[in-house]
């Protein structure tokens, strides 16, 4: 994600405070210069950058500060607060009502990724248990209906459109009426892309809006145009009642920061951001968690939401087995399935404090997903006895012929099968030790259920299993312990502690 470059530069500037022996005006000005340069390079409007600098300077009076105060943390807090303000329009975004029919109309310029974004939004709500559908009212662009149809079919989302009817108002009206009669909760209408100067298309957009009376009009905006987004958003707001904005293509353009701040300047709430071409490269936009992730401070709230989506609490049988320190190959297979359901690895890693959104490149991510699928393919070639055995890898060591059979069945080498079994053995040993810790699976605050000595042992075991590079990014053992504590308590509000920003 190109925005990660901005995050890395700002984080580097903030960390320079830690290297300074004394925090004085000179150090503060040097740090602010680095932050402002990074923002200007990301195409943030110079007036907004100047305002941020002035606000931080006025909030931090080094001469008036009491000697006992932690000046570094006060400065970091002030910068964090101003960065949040930079992308916060200060307007509450529209949200759909469960059990009600919510009609959402998409508008935007040609090439902004509007049709793809329609499918992403429908898929996002579908995964959360909403009844969603898509309507293609774009009769201007050749192939628009085919594209929407292809996306909808792949995601198994009902859709409506026509190859013969050329009036978008009729298509939109018929589609909305059809899906309302079928009690769909999220009805998304894709309209023709337009350019600012095309009055006829603007007129068409108004006619469609008047016909279907949408609950929310979403303007889809391409991040690559940077701060020019402000003029565009205002032009559309003047014509129709744009209630929300989705910014796309944030993964490939250095001007993403400028685009986000420009939209915020129009007082239009950004509800989602597009971070890639795949259907799950799509995230809700929340200002504080966004800045937290940008600076490598994580988003525990978002991570917990992802885990809750999997409904892991329903898996009582697994919890019971873990209590007794049991973990089979089938259990590992099911956990791999859960990881796949959570979405792109880079998105998940960005939510873990200590990892930036740049920690895993697209190439590494694809490689990791391919490796995970390969491991699952190997397990697909195992029989029930092998998958459900509590002896795990011992079944294979007693009868080496099983390894050769699984390797042939999955089209891999015997070494690949042995590597999987080695990995599984590490997991199983960890679970066995966890099973011996009373109170670990009671739920609630882990610190109240588990003794400090047992918790220390558990953290040491986890640290041994982890890649040293990963542990370093988390801030060593202290970072790992802090993350475990936050995740168990479901505490999203104190994620800043991960980088030492405890007073934020």
From Swiss-Prot:
Its EC number is 3.6.5.4. It is linked to Neutropenia, severe congenital 8, autosomal dominant: A form of severe congenital neutropenia, a disorder of hematopoiesis characterized by maturation arrest of granulopoiesis at the level of promyelocytes with peripheral blood absolute neutrophil counts below 0.5 x 10(9)/l and early onset of severe bacterial infections. Residues 296-504 are annotated as: M-domain. The keyword Ion transport does not apply. PANTHER family: SIGNAL RECOGNITION PARTICLE 54K PROTEIN SRP54 (PTHR11564), SIGNAL RECOGNITION PARTICLE SUBUNIT SRP54 (PTHR11564:SF5). Component of the signal recognition particle (SRP) complex, a ribonucleoprotein complex that mediates the cotranslational targeting of secretory and membrane proteins to the endoplasmic reticulum (ER). As part of the SRP complex, associates with the SRP receptor (SR) component SRPRA to target secretory proteins to the endoplasmic reticulum membrane. Binds to the signal sequence of presecretory proteins when they emerge from the ribosomes. Displays basal GTPase activity, and stimulates reciprocal GTPase activation of the SR subunit SRPRA. Signal peptide: none annotated. It is found in: Nucleus speckle; Cytoplasm; Endoplasmic reticulum. Keywords: Cytoplasm, Disease variant, Endoplasmic reticulum, GTP-binding, Hydrolase, Nucleotide-binding, Nucleus, Ribonucleoprotein, RNA-binding, Signal recognition particle. This is Signal recognition particle subunit SRP54.
């Amino acid at each position: 994600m190109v925005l990660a470059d901005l995050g890395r530069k700002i984080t580097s500037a903030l960390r320079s405070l830690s290297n300074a022996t004394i925090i004085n005006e000179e150090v503060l000005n040097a740090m602010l210069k680095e932050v402002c340069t990074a923002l200007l390079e990301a195409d943030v409007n110079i007036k907004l950058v100047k305002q941020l600098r002035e606000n931080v300077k006025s909030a931090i009076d080094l001469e008036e500060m009491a000697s006992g105060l932690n000046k570094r943390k006060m400065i970091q807090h002030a910068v964090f607060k101003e960065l949040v303000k930079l992308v916060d329009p200060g307007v509450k975004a529209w949200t759909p009502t469960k059990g009600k029919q919510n009609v959402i109309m998409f508008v935007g310029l040609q090439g902004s990724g509007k049709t793809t974004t329609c499918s992403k939004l429908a898929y996002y709500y579908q995964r959360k248990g909403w009844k969603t559908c898509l309507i293609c009212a774009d009769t201007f662009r050749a192939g628009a209906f085919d594209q929407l149809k292809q996306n909808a079919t792949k995601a198994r989302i009902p859709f409506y459109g026509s190859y013969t009817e050329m009036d978008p108002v009729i298509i939109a009206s018929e589609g909305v009426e059809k899906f309302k009669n079928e009690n769909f909760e999220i009805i998304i209408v894709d309209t023709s892309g337009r350019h600012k100067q095309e009055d006829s298309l603007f007129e068409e957009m108004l006619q469609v809006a008047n016909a279907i009376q949408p609950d929310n009009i979403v303007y889809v905006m391409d991040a690559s145009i940077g701060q020019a987004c402000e003029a565009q958003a205002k032009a559309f707001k003047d014509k129709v009642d744009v209630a929300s904005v989705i910014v796309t293509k944030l993964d490939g353009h250095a001007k993403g920061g400028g685009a986000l701040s420009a939209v915020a300047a129009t007082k239009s709430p950004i509800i989602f951001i597009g971070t890639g071409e795949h259907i799950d490269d799509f995230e809700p936009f929340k200002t504080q968690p966004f800045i937290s992730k940008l600076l490598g401070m994580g988003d525990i709230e978002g991570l917990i939401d992802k885990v809750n989506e999997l409904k892991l609490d329903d898996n009582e049988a697994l919890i019971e087995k873990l209590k007794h320190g049991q973990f089979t190959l089938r259990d590992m297979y099911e956990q791999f399935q859960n990881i796949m359901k959570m979405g792109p690895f880079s998105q998940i890693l960005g939510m873990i404090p200590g990892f930036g959104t740049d920690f895993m490149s697209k190439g590494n991510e694809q490689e990791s997903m391919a490796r995970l699928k390969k491991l699952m393919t190997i397990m697909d070639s195992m029989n029930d006895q092998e998958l459900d055995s509590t002896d795990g890898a011992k079944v294979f060591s007693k009868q080496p012929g099983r390894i050769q059979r699984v390797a042939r069945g999955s089209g891999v080498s015997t070494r690949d099968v042995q590597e999987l079994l080695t990995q599984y053995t590490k997991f199983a040993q960890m679970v066995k030790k966890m099973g011996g810790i009373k109170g670990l699976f009671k739920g609630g605050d882990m610190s109240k259920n588990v003794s400090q000595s047992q918790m220390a042992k558990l953290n040491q075991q986890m640290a041994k299993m982890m890649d040293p590079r990963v542990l370093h990014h988390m801030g060593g053992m202290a970072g790992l312990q802090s993350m475990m504590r936050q995740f168990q308590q479901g505490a999203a509000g104190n994620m800043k502690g991960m980088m030492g920003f405890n007073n934020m």
